[in-house]
């Protein structure tokens, strides 16, 4: 009960990446506003959308949608075709990743980590990264890019990807 009281009033940020053909990122999903309200501003409408369960909290949330990952596009000829392998790293950094299959990765600090640095000091866990897919790929993925770019959206520094938790029990135990 004391921890619930302490958490009340704290500012939080949740960043959800939808890639690789999820319904909300297709032309159909965008037209149906599956993950983005049709109207912008304080009068946004959460129905009918996947966001409807957030309706009781609408006065406390801000939804940023329809962002792009243009920096995942190829800048040079050898990068052509690697957009998918760069997009997750670009999502919150908006930086173009260094093409490498080694440990010398470099992309940029992600916005969630800037947020955690500013608002997270007053919380027991300033930042937590969760995922629903396996992230245990090793080595290079394709097009000369390290798998860490595909597997990571949060970066504490340009060369420091943050590991994600897939197991709900591990996340619960940390909380």
Give the predicted meaning of each segment.
Residues 1-175:
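Ligand-binding pockets and gating/stacking loops
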